Amino acid sequence: MKRLFSIILLLLVSISFLTAQNTDNEETPDDYYEDISYKANGAGDQYIKIALMGMFPLNFGDKLSTGGAAEIGYHRFVSEYFALGFDVQFGYNPTIGSNMFTYVPMTFTGTFQPYIGNFEFPLTFGIGAALESYLNRNYFPGLILKGQAGFFYRVAESWSFGVESEYMYMPQWYADHKEWNDYGLFLSAGLIARYHF
């Protein structure tokens, strides 16, 4: 009797193990799957940009030579593809008289940045003010408009490196001396490092 009871108990336990496993691997309504996809940037992501550029004057003839510029900027993504930020640049161009035209543009920027894998293609428009100085004339606030296009490679989650070109329009309007009114058009090409956080 004990043996029969033991065999029946063993069969019941074995049958419960066999029926406990789902052999057809079908999804049930209780199964939960999370779609994980990599996005290079999301709302709230930020980056700091550091740039060294050559500055090429476009409308001064031979009066203004090729110069240089350095730029630092802070940008924050408001969506996966769009960022708002602020850039400060220091630029200079020598003149034919061995003098120096210097300018410090400060711009608010909007950037649209599509990407493919680790390659990023930012398109930026900026508007702001510039402090401009030549000989004994200082001009502030001078309007500045700029457009930028770049190509970057994201080498790590926190760093991207690339090249960027910038077209800059800087007018000078004088109320008292209309004969001094002028504008500058500059094209730049630069090497850029960006730290993402």
PLM segments and residue spans:
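Gram-negative (and chloroplast) outer-membrane scaffold detector with strong preference
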Residues: 68-145, 153-161, 193-197
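Short glycine/proline- and aromatic-enriched beta-strand/turn motifs that initiate or cap beta-hairpins
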Residues: 20-78, 83, 134, 188-197
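Outer-membrane beta-barrel domain signature
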Residues: 39-41, 58-63, 95-99, 134-140, ...
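Hydrophobic secondary-structure block in the mid-to-C-terminal portion of proteins
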Residues: 169-197
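Internal, hydrophobic beta-strand segments that form the core of beta-sheet-rich folds
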Residues: 164-166
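Bacterial Sec-dependent N-terminal signal peptides
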Residues: 1-23
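Solvent-exposed loop and beta-edge segments used for protein-protein assembly and interaction
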Residues: 42-44, 64, 100-102, 115-117, ...
